[in-house]
Amino acid sequence: AIVAKVDVKEVAERAGIPDIVRESTGELAGSAVDVLRRQIVAIDAIASGTAYRLTGRDPATRPTSPSGLEEETGAGRKGRGQVTGHYAGPLSRLSAFLIDTAIVWFSFLLTIAGIAFIVDVFSRGETPPATDLGPIGLAVLAVWAFLYMWASLTIAGRTLGMGIVGIRVVDRQGEPLSARQSLIRTVVFPFSFLIFGLGFLGIFISPERRTMHDAAAGSVVVYDWGDRTAEMPAPLTRWVSRRAEELATIDSE
C-alpha cells in the first residue's frame, strides 16, 4: 500500500535520474563520434605529412595553426595529442564535403518532390517526375548548393558536414569569416575542381593546408570539436613527440 502511494516519477526527477540519463546518452554518442574523428585526424596527419615530406620539407617544421587562434598542444586525456585550432587535413575536409553533398542532394530532392506532389494534385498528373531535373533543375540545384554553403559559412563558420566531422573555416588570423569572404570562398570553390582538382593540391603541400578557394578568400580550415577537445590517437601523439625531440637534438648540435 505504501509503495502504491509513492510517486515514482517525482522521486526520479528529484534524484536527477532523467538528467543523468540524458547526459550519459549524450556523452556516449559524443564519444562514438570522437573515436571516428580521431582516426580521421590520424589519417590527415599521415597523408599530409607524407606529401609535405615529398616536397623536401620536414612536417615537424610546418605551422600548426593561425597566429591569432588559441591552439591546444601537448598530450591530453590518455596521452592523446590535442589538436584544437590546428590546420585540418585532407580526409577531414573530404569527409565533410561528401556529407554536405548528400545533405544538399537529399534536401533538394525532397523539396522538389514536395512541390511536384502539390503541383501534380492540381494539374491532374501532367507534371514530369521530380527526379527529371533538366537544365533548369540543375541550375536551381546549383543555386541551392551555393546558398547552403554561403549561408552556413557566414552564420556558423561551417556547414553541417563540417560540424559533424569537427572542422571550422576561419580567416588566416583565426577570426570568423566575413560575409564577403564566405561569398568569395563559395564562388571560387567549384573552380578548385578544374584540371583534375589541382585547386586542392594545397591541402597537401601548402604550409597552412590552403586550397585555391582558401587562398582567394583568405581563409583556412581548422579542427574544432565544439565544447570537446580535438585529439589525435595516443600512438601517433607519441611518434610526433619523439620526432620533435629528435629535431630539437639536431638543432642543438
Where are these regions (language model features)?
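Amphipathic, rod-like alpha-helical scaffolds used for oligomerization/assembly
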Residues: 1-79
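Short helix-terminus and kink motifs of transmembrane alpha helices
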Residues: 149, 153-154, 158, 162, ...
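Voltage-sensor-like transmembrane helices and their cytoplasmic interface
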Residues: 7-10, 16, 162-168, 217
